[in-house]
Amino acid sequence: MKNLLFGFVCFGIWPVFSQSTLEQQFIDIEPKVIAWRRHFHQNPELSNREYKTAEKIASHLKSLGLEVETGVAKTGVVGLLKGAQPGKVIALRADIDALPVTERNSLPFKSEVKTTFLNTETGVMHACGHDTHTAILMGVAEILAQNKNKINGTVKFIFQPAEEGPPPGEEGGAPLMIKEGVLKNPNVDAIFGLHIRSNYEVGTIHYKKGGTMAAVDRFIVQVKGKQTHGGRPWQGVDPILISAKIIDGFQSIISRNTKLVDEAAVISVGKITAGTRFNIIPETTEFIGTIRTLDPNMRTLIIERMESICTNVATAYGGEASLQVEEQTAITFNDSNLVDKMLPSLEKVVGKENVRIRKATTGGEDFSYFQKEIPGFYFFLGGMTPGNKKFYPHHTPDFTIDESGLITGVKVFTQMTFDFLNQ
């Protein structure tokens, strides 16, 4: 794999680029990346509270001579590296926040951090791999800073807080970074992001053109009927019955109105609130759920059908119903032209056979908001020991990854940067 990468570097674009020098730089950076990852893993911080994480990132970027901006979207850090010649601007993004999860494994760098989250005592853990993303991007920054005389253009390193979502009542994450101008001054031409996966083998890269992760919407339906005695339902209007009919109707949208051979879609109800006593039919009910879509037109269709079902079903049973939809994340939509341009970069690092097309998932990712502004490519990095089919899912207390996969992330981001800026 190294021969493919460095052969391209030597003979494809940079004839004066030293294969042995770059190879040694990767060898030297790997233990640093692993050490950074372990530090962040042992010292995790929740969304919009990544103060010490941001300090360590900023200190490293400043030591490399980068222009550094802190306090972006509360705790974000942005580093700017200007190459030897002017040119295009590329952004590389890593998320830096942890989760309110109590770690259960026996790693020597296991998190022992405790906090109160939503009035509940909990541990704090990097249970989604953001510690690895942060360490990888710090490593990329060091490699590119050492070779900035080979860069034609500018690299913007975006260390983003609150990907998991800001605390209730706060702004944060990618939308706030965009609002504060992270893609401006200089204007970014394209953005790249990665996510490590505990179920993909080390040395593999996984991607999908178009919708790769779902738009996530939260919906609230409020139903109004007429309260009455449970023994005399004919004297009232039962909002629980209306809610049941609406929920049933929502599932018919998926099975009868969406073209599932194109993309997947999901409507799930997660909470229903109604009534006070077993013998009273209540006045109102409320139920809350999520919509997951991978196509913007399908999302529009689903919401329109949900509105129609709410109104018409409630009217048919003598009640009223309202639907409120709140966007949580947009569709993580990989620009097809950009993917086509960058696939050779991935293949040079891990080999064509290890760059694999994946199916879309119905999880969400706020990298999607960057992609709404500029072309972007979001892909997945293997973090499972080869041959070991046992893995622990993300967002669980036992989650862990094989650290030998981190250097692949450093190499891939480095290759993509050189290729994009020198095309």
Language model: regions and residue ranges:
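Extracytoplasmic/secreted proteins, especially bacterial periplasmic and envelope-associated proteins
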Residues: T21, D28, K32-A35, H39, ...
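Bacterial Sec-dependent N-terminal signal peptides
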Residues: M1-T21
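Acidic/His- and Gly-rich active-site-bordering loop/insert found
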Residues: Q19-M125, A135-N152
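Metal-dependent amide/peptide-bond hydrolase catalytic core
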Residues: S63, A244-Q423
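Histidine/acidic-residue-rich, glycine-tolerant segments that coordinate divalent metal ions
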Residues: K114-M125, D131-T132, I143-L144, N149-K271, ...
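Divalent metal-coordination and catalytic microenvironments
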Residues: F40, G79, L92, H130, ...
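Soluble non-cytosolic domains of exported or imported proteins
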Residues: I27-P31, P44-E55, A127, D131, ...
